[in-house]
Amino acid sequence: MPKVRTKDIIEQFQLELVSGAEGIYRPITTSDLSRPGIEMAGYFAYYPAERLQLLGRTELSFYETLTPEEKKSRMERLCTDITPGIIVSRGLEVPPELIEASERQSVPVMRSTMKTTRLSSRLTNYLESKLAPTTAVHGVLVDVYGVGVLITGKSGVGKSETALELVKRGHRLVADDCVEIRQEDEDTLVGSAPELIEHLLEIRGLGIINMMTLFGAGAVRTHKRISLVVDLELWDPEKQYDRLGLEEEKVKILDTELPKLTIPVRPGRNLAVIVEVAAMNFRLKRLGVNAAEEFSARLSDAIEDGAHDYD
């Protein structure tokens, strides 16, 4: 099933449907828009017919200089069986030749009162959001001090319990158990909860808890950009864990790499506090403060000074 149809665009931007009503269920498969200026001049060799077509004052003022035969020909070639729609901006008058051609090909022709550039920008942002690559990850997403922290790990390791403690400490839950992730940009991943389990948290022994009902609207968020991955794993005595923080792990989700911390779980460790500190430390690093690197530099200086003393 297509993610976006022309009907969705009409409803989202309150567009006036002028003609071609039979085609409002056509799928929109790309976030790219086309302003067919060169096509108005008669060059259709590289006409991107699969895109939404946007006609502004520039295109329509040139169109008015054409002969009646040219006008009819241009609009007939503009309306194809794969064109999802044609939008006229600025509330301009829709050419009768376009209405006739669109009715024959069932191409929706819409009109907006917005300026062309603003409409183009808003359409692109909307389509990029809706058509972005998506995936689902088993984990919990929490907003901790403004940092989107994705908590992962095997079932039963304590992800939901950690999220519950974080919410109790004033942070906000985004999703539990299943996190839907969409890639809105090359380096931007946004996580949200499936509609069915939105605001719900499952705790073994307690069952399902509605966090918004229990803690209020301030305890939940609908979506959040993911900045950090915290992987919880049962403590393995055979494994060497990072104790300085100089080595930064990365994990790839879709086409975006995110910093990852592996936190060993054992009785007595307060995981919620550790996740809080991890989020604060992440913010510090973004501000250019890296405690591990500063300690390493001081240690190197001390060793070097000690070596000189022995000399």
From Swiss-Prot:
Residues forming the catalytic site: 138, 159, 177, 243
CDD domains the record matches: HprK_C
Presence of keyword Magnesium: yes
The protein's required cofactors: Mg(2+)
Organism superkingdom: Bacteria
Transmembrane feature ranges: none
Region (Important for the catalytic mechanism of dephosphorylation): 264-269
Sequence positions that bind ATP: 153-160
EC number(s) stated in the UniProt entry for this protein: 2.7.11.-, 2.7.4.-
InterPro entries: HPr(Ser)_kin/Pase (IPR003755), Hpr_kin/Pase_C (IPR011104), Hpr_kin/Pase_Hpr_N (IPR011126), P-loop_NTPase (IPR027417), Ser_kin/Pase_Hpr-like_N_sf (IPR028979)
Example GO BP: regulation of carbohydrate metabolic process
Residue positions binding Mg(2+): 160, 202
PANTHER family in UniProt: HPR KINASE_PHOSPHORYLASE (PTHR30305:SF1), PROTEIN YJDM-RELATED (PTHR30305)
HAMAP family with a match to the protein in the record: HPr_kinase
Domain notes: The Walker A ATP-binding motif also binds Pi and PPi.
Family, similarity comment: Belongs to the HPrK/P family.
Annotated function: Catalyzes the ATP- as well as the pyrophosphate-dependent phosphorylation of a specific serine residue in HPr, a phosphocarrier protein of the phosphoenolpyruvate-dependent sugar phosphotransferase system (PTS). HprK/P also catalyzes the pyrophosphate-producing, inorganic phosphate-dependent dephosphorylation (phosphorolysis) of seryl-phosphorylated HPr (P-Ser-HPr).
Protein name: HPr kinase/phosphorylase
Species this protein is from: Geobacillus kaustophilus (strain HTA426)
Organism taxonomic ancestry: Bacteria, Bacillati, Bacillota, Bacilli, Bacillales
GN (gene name): hprK
